[in-house]
Amino acid sequence: RILSQDDKTIPLLPVSTKATTAIPTYIAGGVSTAYRFVTPDNVEKNLSESTFKKVSKEVLDQVKGVSSLIKYFVMTYKNPNLDGLSILDTPGFNSNDSEDKERTIEVINECDALFWVFDVNAGTVNRSSISLIKEKLNKPLYVVINKVDTKPKSEVDKVEALISKTLKDAGLKVEKYIRFSAKAPLEDIMAPIKSVGSTSENDTFVEDVQTDLEGLSKKYEST
């Protein structure tokens, strides 16, 4: 909902409890809608909207070698929710694909905070994800319990208690637990996101993307 602004015409990233995001994808506000990808040697290339929509983990699994040619995607469009904010969607820690995990590890600490989203209906915490986050993450951790409108509050309380105990027992510090759903006010998720201060000292990944976005904005402003 942050990305779509509750507008059904906005292209969305694939969403599932399974690993669906194929390649780290940066989403940011811009003067116009644009899709690009950046190669491992930092060469920027334009991408059509139709191609962007077709890229999924399933597709890349079928076309071997393509994912190694793309460092990350950048999607920009007009969105007041993204003023001063960029969201990085990653393949995730809970993927069974070792390459997905490596991609996530490579970029995760370039962000100011990690928002770990749990489906309230899943009911479990992935142990391998906990191990990787504990070992690799050195940024603030927030837990988002999503789809809370699909269960009674008493059940949501139990899920949060289970997640909290599991992470605490594993030695993971959680800055805040956030409950969210399709019916909740967008501010319920935007407020904690915007409260996160910049913590990165060497934001090379972020700086590269911001430079790309500034160049794109100037290009459109001059035309």
Language-model segments: which ranges?
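Globular "head" domains of long coiled-coil molecular machines
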Residues: 1-215
